[in-house]
Every structure is written in C-alpha cells, then in structure tokens.
Amino acid sequence: FINTIRLLINKYREWKNKKDS
C-alpha cells in the first residue's frame, strides 16, 4: 500500500515537472 502511494507521488512529481516546463 505504502509502495503504491510512493509511486503515485513520484508520477505526480514527474507530471508536475513536465507541466511546469
């Protein structure tokens, strides 16, 4: 469960990075 949350946060950060760029 925690692993999934960490993965989601990682994807969210990547998506945010791409959006900011």
UniProtKB/Swiss-Prot annotation:
The keyword Secreted belongs to this UniProt entry's keyword annotation: yes
Any one GO cellular component localisation term in the record: extracellular region
Keywords: Amidation, Secreted, Toxin
Tissues of expression: Expressed by the venom gland.
Compartments it resides in: Secreted
Superkingdom field: Eukaryota
GO molecular function list: toxin activity
Annotated positions of the Serine amide modification: S21
Family label: Belongs to the cationic peptide 04 (cupiennin) family. 09 subfamily.
Name by which UniProt lists this protein: Cupiennin-6c
Lineage: Eukaryota, Metazoa, Ecdysozoa, Arthropoda, Chelicerata
